[in-house]
Design a protein with these regions (language model features):
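Extracellular beta-strand-rich, repetitive "passenger/adhesive" scaffolds
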Residues: 1-75, 81-351, 355-418
Length: 418
């Protein structure tokens, strides 16, 4: 069956179930002024929701290609269960506001997308209700949630497959705890008012725009060889503790472009219970408010980088296999241990305003400030409990060591001072 079926300004009296079965080349539209009091089941190639009220359960399946942009303006008073069974896109509440007064279940059985709130439309999820993946699963494709406000504190849980991507988009507000698992993960402008726990299980480099506010504890786990970029373009605010885990070999990179982040006073950034055995953690453009001590303990196979534009106002302790200083200001003491055998070359450009104590416990080397000047405004102590080497400066780049007090070098250590 092909063609168009548009239902508008229709009021159903009574609760008889309605079943609308159209072909993959057909289009079904629920238009403004329609009120359906019974359960509605629909299967169609293309699907639009443009201002209807559903008082019974809605079950809808899109089977055809194409991007279907629903205007919005709908009221859903019962469960909504929408499945994308195509490589096309379902776009909900694009221009006007939707109201979800019951659970919202979204599934994808093909490679298509379900996108919500991508333009000016918004949505409200009623108190005690959830938005989640439906019984058919979300093994691949993309789910993007935008401009959705959750009323109340009901926990939300999103479980997608390792080939699927999940985006928390612009204008969302979640008032309950949020947990998610997905192959790819993007954080692009959402406010989380309770705890947020996320796991990335798939490959690929995921660059989150940023612009998020985290008012509860945040715990992010990388369980793949992929890359997670946080606050790449816009600023994030972490108003509670920030925990990172890496259970594979991937990288978590923060503030690598124009975005910045602020960690609230009294809060910590540290490794979570899942550990950070391998891979990389790069902390860039990150400002800690207040003097709370920070402790970053990574495994011997993991790399830790203190990146450009970061400011730590508390004492910092770190342990990692590889260690890099790429342009951070430390206003407290620094005590770092390198436990891995690699040759680590730091760019430099750091300011150490407190006592700095760096220890190597393995073979390999550490080259400090290779391309930009470091400033040490308190004692520098270098220790070596193995046979590795410290190299201070790079004569080719013309860098220098500036000591306003003095350096203490503990044997046995091979040190080159330029």
């Amino acid at each position: 069956m092909a063609g168009f079926l548009t239902i508008g300004k229709l009021t159903q009296v009574g609760g008889t179930a309605q079943d609308l079965m159209l072909g993959t080349n057909a289009t079904l539209t629920f238009n403004a002024g329609t009120v359906l009091n019974g359960n509605v089941t629909a299967t169609t190639g293309r699907l639009y929701f443009n201002g209807a009220t559903f008082n019974g359960k809605l079950t809808a399946i899109k089977t055809g290609p194409g991007s279907d942009e629903s205007n919005g303006g709908n009221v859903f008073n019962n469960i909504v269960d929408i499945t994308n069974a195509s490589n096309g896109a379902i776009i909900l509440y694009q221009n006007f506001d939707d109201l979800f007064n019951n659970d919202v279940l979204l599934s994808n059985t093909s490679s298509g997308q379900i996108l919500t709130g991508q333009l000016t439309g918004t949505a409200t999820l009623a108190a005690t209700r959830i938005i989640s993946v439906g019984a058919s699963g979300f093994a691949s494709g993309a789910l993007s949630i935008g401009r959705l406000t959750q009323i109340g504190s009901t926990a939300q849980n999103f479980v997608l497959g390792s080939s699927a991507s999940l985006t928390f988009g612009v204008g969302n507000t979640f008032n309950g705890t949020v947990s998610s698992t997905s192959g790819r993960l993007y954080l692009n402008g959402t406010t989380f008012n309770d705890s947020f726990t996320a796991v990335k299980t798939g490959f690929g480099s995921d660059a989150s725009n940023g612009g998020n506010t985290y008012n509860g504890p945040t715990e992010i786990t990388l369980a793949s060889a992929g890359i997670m970029y946080l606050y790449h373009y816009s600023d994030d605010a972490f108003n509670d503790d920030l925990l990172f885990n890496n259970t594979s070999t991937g990288q978590i990179l923060m503030g690598q472009f124009t975005g910045n982040a602020v960690l609230a006073a009294g809060r910590v950034i540290e490794v979570g219970a899942g550990g950070f055995t391998n891979g990389m953690l790069n902390i860039g453009r990150f400002t800690q408010i207040g003097p709370t001590p920070q402790n970053l303990v990574l495994g011997n196979g993991a790399a830790l980088a203190f990146g450009t534009g970061s400011v730590f106002n508390g004492n910092v302790i770190s342990s990692s296999g590889s260690l890099f200083y790429h342009g951070t200001t430390f206003n407290g003491t620094v005590r770092s241990t390198k436990n891995g055998p690699g040759n680590d070359t730091s760019r430099g450009g750091n300011i150490f305003n407190g006592h700095t104590d760096i220890t190597m416990t393995a073979t390999g080397s550490m080259n400090l400030y290779s391309t930009a000047n470091d400033i040490y405004n308190a004692d520098l102590r270098l220790s070596n409990t193995s046979v590795g080497q410290f190299r201070l400066g790079n004569p080719v780049a013309g860098s220098q060591l500036k000591l306003l007090f003095h350096a203490v070098l503990i044997a046995p250590v091979h040190v080159y001072v330029v």
